[in-house]
Amino acid sequence: MAKIIGIDLGTTNSCVAILEGGKPRVIENSEGARTTPSIVAFTADNEVLVGQSAKRQAITNPKNTLFAIKRLIGRRYKDDVVQKDIKMVPYTIVEAENGDAWVEVGGKKMAPPEISARVLMKLKKDAEAYLGEEVKEAVITVPAYFNDSQRQATKDAGRIAGLDVKRIINEPTAAALAYGMDKSRGDQKIAVYDLGGGTFDISIIEIAEVDGEHQFEVLSTNGDTFLGGEDFDLRIIEYIVDEFRKEQGIDLHNDPLALQRLKESAEKAKIELSSSQQTEINLPYITADATGPKHLNVKLTRAKLEALVEDLILRTRGPCETALKDAGLKSADIDEVILVGGQTRMPKVQEFVKEIFGREPRKDVNPDEAVAVGAAIQAGVLGGQVKDVLLLDVTPLSLGIETLGGVMTKLIEKNTTIPTKATQVFSTAEDNQTAVTIHVLQGEREMARDNKSLGRFDLSDIPMAPRGVPQIEVTFDIDANGILNVSAKDKATGKQQSIVIRASSGLSEDEIKRMVKDAELHAEEDRRMHELVSARNHADAVVHATNKTLAELGDKVSGEERAKIEAALNDLKDAMGGDNKDLIEQRTSALTELSGKLAERLYTQQGGTAGSETHSHEKAGGSGGDDVVDAEFEEVRDDKR
């Protein structure tokens, strides 16, 4: 049976896991790391880099290196949080035709799901390399407080990456699965405090044994989808920029290269200050003016960092208190607090969590891997490998429609267990009204305009009648992914209209199909490029071995024979400069045949010693070619950077 992988698609880092023999296992990426930076870069020679390789070259390629894209997914360009982000990132955020926030690289506009799909494609490829088989299905996690548009956009990203997304689950719920699979813990009420790279979630979850099943019931959830480690980094960057402006009179905001260097240094400084009291940010040649180059040197203490981010940490208090209230619990009722997300490693955050819940948070759950592990467990449930687990998640925000006077009438309240269905009958607002517009909303405010608009559709051909007489039945149906379907039916005629909510923005079916095709083409280009590089590396090894043999034999090679070999060498070098893999392989074979005779002669003349050495070179260029490829290719790319 095909494997379903579990993916934590994070703002800063992503992680992939699988269930093996009933146990979850995090899969290392091709670089040997257990997490992959959620960074995608486009180079000058049209190469797409993902993960660590993209992060390494970010400083020299800031405008074409995309990070924290998850903060834009499913968002409108005019959103305040997007406008704030535009000022702080070195890449270009633009408004798409449908009003969504997209990015622009090299004159090409791209949707956030398209960029996230690149990260998913790498995770998929790494999982396939580990499993030795094709992966087609995945469970992907999202912040619990993601709205419908953001969930749909995440599902679109999976589809573009060639994955059938079997389930979208909430990150804190996944972390609870990872923590609570140890059945010896008994019945518990836990709080999952998830402060990641770009989002904050708090979920109150009850773990219990019910009729022999291990039941995970989400009692409530709350959060902030624009609060995370990236904001902590930005506070450090702003502080450094202000200090430098005071000292040098230069504003580094206008220099993308300087901003990228500052971002990297801010992240390192923040991490260092979790284990030390002071660090130094030292960036020589950060910029220059008419008087010459300028160097940046700023000392940052843990106390100063805590002062800079205090209000960000305090912003998590409100959602925590609301989640407890919605669950009908007090902090004393919570048995354990689980920390998820890299930002929870900050001592001040841990102190704050202890203050809110009155207990030490647990440190035995890996904050970087727990979510992916939970996703893998849910994948095991869907795949039938895990049989005694029941997961009851909730919808994070209320759902309803706009009614007379611009009011939002709720059909499904927040924290309702999903999947769920709700039906309500409405009528017309005017006499002889023959059509109604159903405006679908998500949020907690009273007025429609203050909530998130998910979409609109019309129900027409209603028979003329006085106002209030027609009966229009509106049904909201939320699936297990938290994605909404809405239908409206005229009870008199039976006429029905329905939509799967794709937001008033979002990607159209045609756009998704185009992006899927682009991704497939890109994968084919990757394969061809890999084969070409393998052929070049093999050829390079044969050239090296042949030159060495010629040098060692010296004047023992006849002029005619040397001329033939040198001609073959030059032909191969010419081919290596081009992109014709078949030609390179053909000329490599020709040179190998000619140089093989030389190797035999050298072996005979020198008693086998030098000959065996030469022979080993040929093997390096032959059957071992694939081993040579990655190492040499990586070095070349590093040099290019």
Curated annotation (Swiss-Prot):
Record's keyword annotation contains Secreted: no
Keyword field: ATP-binding, Chaperone, Nucleotide-binding, Phosphoprotein, Stress response
Phosphothreonine PTM sites in chain numbering: T199
UniProt entry tagged with the keyword ATP-binding: yes
Bias-annotated ranges (Acidic residues): 627-641
Renumbered residue ranges of the record's region Disordered: 603-641
Biased composition (Polar residues): 603-613
Gene3D superfamilies noted in UniProt: 1.20.1270.10, 3.30.420.40, Actin, Chain A, domain 4, Substrate Binding Domain Of DNAk, Chain A, domain 1
Description of what induces expression: By stress conditions e.g. heat shock.
Top-rank taxon: Bacteria
GO molecular function list: ATP binding; ATP-dependent protein folding chaperone; unfolded protein binding
Similarity comment: Belongs to the heat shock protein 70 family.
NCBIfam families: PRK00290.1 (NF001413), PRK05183.1 (NF003520), prok_dnaK (TIGR02350)
Physiological role: Acts as a chaperone.
HAMAP family in the record: DnaK (MF_00332)
Protein name (record): Chaperone protein DnaK
Gene (UniProt): dnaK
